[in-house]
Amino acid sequence: MYGIEYTTILIFLISIILLNYILKSVTRIMDYIIYRFLLITVALFALTRAQNYGLNLPITGSMDTVYTNSTQEEVFLTSTLCLYYPTEASTQINDGDWKDSLSQMFLTKGWPTGSVYFKEYSSIVDFSVDPQLYCDYNLVLMKYDQSLELDMSELADLILNEWLCNPMDITLYYYQQSGESNKWISMGSSCTVKVCPLNTQTLGIGCQTTNVDSFEMVAENEKLAIVDVVDGINHKINLTTTTCTIRNCKKLGPRENVAVIQVGGSNVLDITADPTTNPQTERMMRVNWKKWWQVFYTIVDYINQIVQVMSKRSRSLNSAAFYYRV
């Protein structure tokens, strides 16, 4: 009987010793794996960081300056330039290699091949619905058209400024504008915006809140509309929600990495949204040529002077980001 008990105790002790040995072995193996993994991770991180030195160098002075990466032999420029032009330009030029030709010309001004991107848009109206300004510097060419003068002004006001925007639920709430920097911006394939100003008893001023036909129309069948109403007064808003969206926006200030080149027209458009703001013409320029080749030649010739009145910014613009924070 005692022999069986001693045997059981002995087996139990041996099991504990064996388990302790196994645990120590596993611990040593895990420590080795973890330390090796950390060593490899640190080494890769150091190499990766070294390859990126110089990518975020600030630009000081002329765009002719190029920077060399300290761990790579390639010469590169830290900035990109996007040139937005209407379909009319490529149609008139009618040359399959015209972009390559212009790239070679930009090269003589200090812009390496691959740093200049050409973006085509069908019309000012369509471009205003989905502006995409992703480069460090963005030049938008707009052919002057008297019938589209207001559309051009609104588009320029949109892309030359930064906006902080929030969605509006016009089915549940009334809205008012707090100041001249506060605007309602609607976008879509067809935007018709009507408003009914309200008094302190929420009764319509010159309109009936239950009758949309009595509302005041401030935009009709537009793709982009920047709506300005009397500040400090609640408004009930009616909108074609199936084809349009509307956002409550505040103008924060100039978007300094964008410039607009107006092609033609007697004067540069004044994009000022209200009479108390000084006209913004520094980044709104005009060239007056009939042929698009001449327009592009002029831009290449003066590209570095144009960039000097701009500032490189990291914030991009598209129709989705614009709604919330640009």
From Swiss-Prot:
PTM details?
A: Intramolecular disulfide bonds.
Its cellular-component GO annotations read: host cell endoplasmic reticulum lumen; T=13 icosahedral viral capsid; viral outer capsid
Keywords assigned: Calcium, Capsid protein, Disulfide bond, Glycoprotein, Host endoplasmic reticulum, Host-virus interaction, Metal-binding, Outer capsid protein, Signal, T=13 icosahedral capsid protein, Virion
The answer to whether the entry has keyword Thylakoid is no
Span of the signal peptide: 1-50
Task: Please indicate which superkingdom the organism of origin belongs to.
Answer: Viruses
Q: What is this protein called?
A: Outer capsid glycoprotein VP7
